[in-house]
Amino acid sequence: MTEKKPTPMMEQWHQCKEKAGDSVLLFRMGDFYEAFYDDAVLLSQHLELTLTQRQGIPMSGIPVSTVDTYVDRLIGKGFKVAVAEQFGEPAKEKESKKIGPMARDIQRFVTPGTLLSSTLLQEKFNNYIVAINRIGSLFGFACLDLSTGSFFIEECENTKELVDEICRLAPSEVLSCNKFYNKETAIVMQLQQHLKLTLSTYADWAFEHKFASQKLTTHFQVASLDGFGLKGLVPAINAAGGLLSYIQDKLLLPTKHIAIPQTRGKQQKLLIDTASQVNLELLAPLNDPQGKNSLLRIMDHTSTPMGGRLLRQILISPFYNPKEILVRQDAVEFFLRQVTLRKNIKTYLCQVRDIERLMTKVTTGLAGPRDIGTLRDSFSAGAQIYEQLASATLPEFFIDKCSLDTKLASLIALLSKSLNGDLPLRVSDGNIFVDEFHNDLKRLRHNQEHSQEWIWEYQERIRKETGIKKLKICFAQALGYYIEVSSEFAPQLPKDFIRRQSRLHAERFTTIELQQFQDDMSNISEKLQTLETQFFKDLCSHILQLRTEILALSQSLADLDYIISLADLAHAQGYCRPRVDMSDTLCIYRGCHPVAKTLVDTGKFIPNDTEMRGSQTRMILLTGPNMAGKSTYIRQIALLVIMAQMGSYIPAKSAHIGVIDKIFTRIGAGDNLSKGMSTFMVEMAETANILHNATDRSLVILDEVGRGTSTYDGLAIAQAVVEYLLFTDKKKAKTLFATHYKELTTLEDHCPHVENFHAGVKDKAGQPVFLYEILKGHSQKSFGIHVARLAGFPLCVVSRAQQILRQLEGPESITRPAQDKMQQLTLF
C-alpha cells in the first residue's frame, strides 16, 4: 500500500517545518494559526487547547486575534516559536487552471531572548541573549537586549570568569555555534545549573572571523571595527557577528535599531562572582526567588523602567574608580538636600514610560498610535524635569546631561499639537490626529460627523434658490443621495441639475456638489484611514530622525532616576555618606544589614562596628554560637561595600571604605548532584576559586570553611586557608572568617594582622541570651545544644547531649547509657 501523497498545503507545512527546526510552528490558515503533528500535541498539553484530527493528522488551532497571547505563553514555558503567514492570491495551476493554496512562509521567529514587544518583558529587567565563542583558551561573548538595542561584548580568560559574567547578566537565551555546544558540555551544564534559560545553536560558519567581522561592518556601514574600540577582540567579534546573523538571517527579526557594540572595562568595576551574588541575596532571597527580602528590592525606589534597569546593572557590577563613585555621591547629596526639587522631579519621573523599548517599536515598525502618545507624554515629562532643573546649580554628574535639545523640543511641540489625547491601539482604528493637523482631515471628518446636518442645510439652500418648497433630498441604495421634485416643478430647476431618474409623478436629480458629498460619504472612512496611515508613517519617520537625541534623553532620565532613588532611600532610612577612596581601610561605625534592618521594628536592629586597616588588621576571626548573628554580620559588611561603591549612602553612622576590586563569599553549600559533587566538594571548589583569584584589594567572606569533613581535617584546611590569605603576596585580602574552630583563635597571638571577635551571648541561669553584638575576643561557648532544643529536639536527646558534653569537657570518659534510660524514638 503506497503512502498517501500530502496535499499542496501540507507540502507547504512540511517545507516550513523544516525551516522551523526545533521551534513550534504556527501555520496561518485563514483566521487561525494551525499546528500539526507533535506541535499540535504540544499546544494541547501546554496551552490547554483542543486536540483534533484530520485524516489521521493531529491538529490544534489558535485564532489570529489572540496569537500573541498564546505565543507569550509558549515563550514563558521556554519554547521557541516560528510563525508562518499567508500572503498574495491563491495560486493557479497553468494547465488545469485549478486554484491552489495561497503562498505561505515563515515570517518571524520568537525566542525567549529575542522578544521585541511582549507581556513577558519585565519593565525593570533587561531581556538578554548572549552568544559565546572560544579561540584557544580565550572566550568571547556578545550580549544583546533586542527590546532596547543595547549591545556589548567582552572577553574572558577562563571558564569560571565566563560563567560568572553570563550568570551576572542572567540572559533568557544563550547562543553558540554547533561545535562549541557539542564540545563545551561542562560550560553548558554550569549555565543550566545557575540559570533558567533556553540554549540555542547556529551554524559554525557564522562564528568564523571573516564572516562575523564582515557581518558587523556591513550592518554598521563601516570599513573597520577598530573605530569602535574592538581591535584585537577576535573571540568577542566572532560572537557578535554570529549573534547578529542569527537574529537577522535565522530569526528574520529587525536589527536596524541595534546599537554599536560597546566594550566593558572590567578593571573599572567591582567584580562579584555568581556564588557571592546568590549568597548575598543581591537580587533574590536564597530560599524564595520571588520574595521581597533582597538588596535590590530594598534599594529600588526608581520610577522609570530605564532607571530600574540601570540600578540592577550597577548593583551586580558596582564601580571601582573612586571618581565615578564620588560624582554620584555628590549628586545624591544634592538631591538629599533639595527636598522640594526632588519631590517635584519624582512626580514627573512617574509619568515617564519605557522610552528605550518604545523607540525600538518605532524603529522596527511595531509602534501603534498609543505608543507614540506614550512617547509624547514621556518627552513632555522630561521637558518639565529639565525646566525644574534649569534654575538649580547642578552637581558635576549632571553637567551637560539636563538640557533639552532644540530639535527634540520642536518634536515635543509637534506631537502635542498634532495628536489626540485619547489614542487608539491600532492605526486602522483612526482618530489619531486632531482636526487642525490637515485641511483634508478636517473636511472629511466634518462631513462624516455632520452629514445629516449638511443634507438639511443643502436642502434648505436649494429650496430657497429654486423656490420649490416641496423639494427634498433622499437616499436610495442604488442611487445614493438624490434630489426629488414633482414633475411639474422639474422645468424650474437650474441647468446644472443632472437628471438621474424619472418616476410617474416625480423627477430625481443630482448636482456636482451633491455628487462630491456622495463620493466623500462613500469613501470617507477609507480616505481617512489612508490619510492617517500616511501621516502616522511620516510622524514615525520624523521621530526616527531624532533617535540619537531621544535615546540620550532616555539615558539622562535613567541616570536622574537612579540618583533620586538613592536619595529617597537615604532619606527614608537615615543613611550616611561613606568616604570612599583608594586607601587600604575598611572602617564602619554602627553599621546595619540593609535588608535585615527593615524586617525588625524600628530601633530593634543592633548596629555593629568594623575596623580593618591594612597596616593593622586584615583578617577578623569571628566565633560564637549559631543564631547569634555571625552570618548576618559578615554578609552585612559585603553589602555595605557594594552599596558604597554604587555611589549610595549606607546604613551606618559613618564609614571609610577603600575600594574593593572583588568580593568572594563561601557561605553554606548544597550537593551539586548534576555534577556529582558532594556538599564538601562544592565548598572546597568555591574556596579554591577564592584562593586563586583574590587580590590584596579583595574582600573575602568565609563562613564555616572545613566543616564538611572530620574535625582535624576541617581544622587543618581552615588554618591553611587563613595562613594563605595572610601571608601570600598579592593575596592578602581583607577577610572575615566565621568559624566554630576555637583552635584558630590562637592565631591572633602570633599573627599581627589577625583579630578575634565574637558574637556576644549572655549566660542567664544556664540559658543563652543573644546580644547580637560583635565584641572583641573569642567566644567561650557555642550553645549548640540550646539551639537544638529550640529546633524541637526531644528533651531526652537534649538531656543526653548535655550529659555527653559535660563528660567531653571533664576528665571522665563518655559513658554508654542503659537501654531503658533512653526513650526509643519512632521513625514516623
Swiss-Prot record:
HAMAP family: MutS. InterPro entries: DNA_mismatch_repair_MutS, DNA_mismatch_repair_MutS-lik_N, DNA_mismatch_repair_MutS/MSH, DNA_mismatch_repair_MutS_C, DNA_mismatch_repair_MutS_clamp, DNA_mismatch_repair_MutS_core, DNA_mismatch_repair_MutS_N, DNA_mismatch_repair_MutS_sf. It comes from Chlamydia pneumoniae. CDD domains: ABC_MutS1 (cd03284). The keyword ATP-binding applies. This protein is involved in the repair of mismatches in DNA. It is possible that it carries out the mismatch recognition step. This protein has a weak ATPase activity. ATP binds at residues 624-631. Gene3D superfamilies: 1.10.1420.10, DNA repair protein MutS, domain I, MutS, connector domain, P-loop containing nucleotide triphosphate hydrolases. Transmembrane segments: none annotated. GO terms for molecular function: ATP binding; ATP-dependent DNA damage sensor activity; damaged DNA binding; mismatched DNA binding. This is DNA mismatch repair protein MutS. One of its GO terms (biological process) is mismatch repair.
